[in-house]
């Protein structure tokens, strides 16, 4: 057994904090059987054709680092601290990952790999071996309260595109439901059609909802994904207080990352619902009347919504409820669905790899013969649409909210 009781400083950097890893995680490092299932399903490994991006490689590297820093192993084996060059090479493999969780899904011994990668990124930040762009993420969020360093007062500007929007612009003092828009949908034109569609559906269905507007801050997922969990608390406190002031009993999210952050890292003060689940309930209650559409679609399960939150059925039920819409499943679907390349801050860290992963996803979708890829994530829509448009792929990408809005009678 490995003695992890003492973890010493790394070179000239700050001490490596052993509190970054739970006891469970340290034990799980010893449980790996080297089966390589993780490498077989990893979108980064398959797109880059680099075995060093696999979970297996990362785990072996982490074990060697921790063992080399522990007194017993250091004395017996003469283990040395990694050089700066070695640290730089290893660190790059850690950030060239979408945090899709597919490795965890197939692990035969049940290692919680996604949690381990988050802890590892936190460790890299604490020890000073993080990617340069990590500090940009931190600074953008500190200064602008959104990851893109945009003016937070413009967070609800997309409301201008809502058909017949009320004078209050969905900014009410009180409401039963808060719609938490998310940074991607608030600021990226390719994704802004999603909140527009959802707002029009909610309005047509008679839902009493409000936005937070400029009082909505980033949910904090980019911080968590970058290893910056230490900076998360102000965002959680602010967003909770903003929702409290609205008196809402329920919060809905079209962004799976926001949805999962609120479910796992926020105190449960209101009911947390993803937009696909909320739409399903509206359909079941007969509040969303559909007109027929002659359309063949395939469905892409977002990583955080599918593998992360286990929401698989709701979006499919909504799709199947629309007359004339035919759903053709991807070869790899539900918990086995392949990432689109948009997660884990990868687009910022390695845009070329992110694009190559998106290419593979688009190619897989084209093989189904579908005219449209439907998903339930604004970042997935943006990532796949960007690749499809740049490369003139003959397929459209649409969020579940956009599909429902397209079929809405009103």
Regions found by a protein language model. Name each.
Residues 3-24, 58-88, 313-324, 345-348, ...:
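Short, charged low-complexity linear segments at domain edges
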Residues 9-51:
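Long, charged N-terminal interaction/targeting segments
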Residues 20-29, 59, 63-254, 259-266:
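Iron-sulfur-cluster electron-transfer modules
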Residues 35-38, 100-103, 303, 341-343:
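Cysteine-cluster motifs in flexible loop/terminal segments that predominantly coordinate metals
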Residues 110, 185-274, 304-321, 326-410:
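Cofactor-cradling patches in redox/metallo enzymes
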Residues 234-238, 278-285:
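Active-site glycine-rich loop that binds ribose-phosphate moieties when present
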Residues 299:
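Hydrophobic alpha-helical positions that pack around
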